[in-house]
Amino acid sequence: MIYRYAEIKDLDEIMGLYKEASLNEWCTWDDSYPDTGICKKDIETESLLCLEDNGTIIAAISFDSDDIVDNLELWNKKYRNKARELARLVVKDSYRNQGIAAKMILKAMAVLKKRGYKAVHYLVSPDNLRAVNSYAKLGFTKAGECELYGYRWHAYEKDLYYIERSITGEFKRTLWNPFVEAIEKYKLIKDGDRIAVCISGGKDSMLLARMLKMAKDYRLYDFSPEYIMMNPGYMERDMKQMEFNNLLFDIPVSYFSTNVFDDVEEIGKNPCFFCSRMRRGHLYRKAKELGCNKIALGHHYDDVIENVCNP
């Protein structure tokens, strides 16, 4: 699947998605909205992101600029003129219930973050219970309720820098400061380093990846990170959850697959030890393939002890 900005040639296909969605009983759209004029404007201003699967557009979302919505009193005042509305989210009926809507929202938020916005907000019909639950899962907070355009809406908003603010604020003394101090003390990063940041899907490596991304974004060090994740044979549902988590943490991950689990299954004795060694070997090879001179692994104290005892 490919995320990309919609083009004029996609107009009819996207309008077809809107039409299909309008037939659902929970949808507030009709024949007059969204119209081709709105869709065309979104395309021309690069404000319409779509998801393509085998040449077919299966989902779309817009980053709208609506003065009426943007100036609602219920929004947090500190984001005034620094927030953008997410609008016209649509997923092809045959692709629903696969988490695609949530991924579209996360992709849109990543785009808006790069454009300098601090927050996003969204109006959703209270009848669309699936969407209401999705926003809570994605960390949106309910700002209130309003009546607009003849409908009742639930209003949600999200700080795009919530994770960064937590790490450098609430957890500054326990996470961010020790992280930076360790890099400085042990000279872990040098100018020009190309570092393969290896993500397993667990909280240790996820946190490490997020903080290294912050170090890069804040230009604390002159290095190039490559975020990689190996699939050693995870179940499909587990892999999808990990992909979702990477989107949620705004980490641009490259994925590659191996047969480690199948190979280890044939080993009767000490499978965990061999699994660890094999996975590490694949990570080293991938890092070299990407031209990296270092790798970064996230370990807690128990991991460190096990690695020292089983080098």
Describe every region a protein language model picked out.
Residues 105, 112-124:
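Conserved GNAT acetyl-CoA-binding A-motif
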Residues 166-310:
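ATP-dependent adenylation/nucleotidyltransferase module used to activate substrates
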Residues 2-16:
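A short beta-loop-alpha structural element at the N-terminal edge
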Residues 60-88, 96:
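Conserved acyl-donor/pantetheine-binding loop and adjacent beta-alpha core of acyl/acetyltransferases
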Residues 19-41:
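Conserved GNAT-fold acetyl-CoA-binding loop/helix
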Residues 91, 97-110, 133-137:
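Conserved acetyl-CoA-binding loop-helix of GNAT-fold acetyltransferases
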Residues 47-62:
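Conserved beta-hairpin
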Residues 96, 122-132, 148-152, 231:
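Conserved beta-strand-loop-alpha-helix junction that forms the acyl-donor binding cleft
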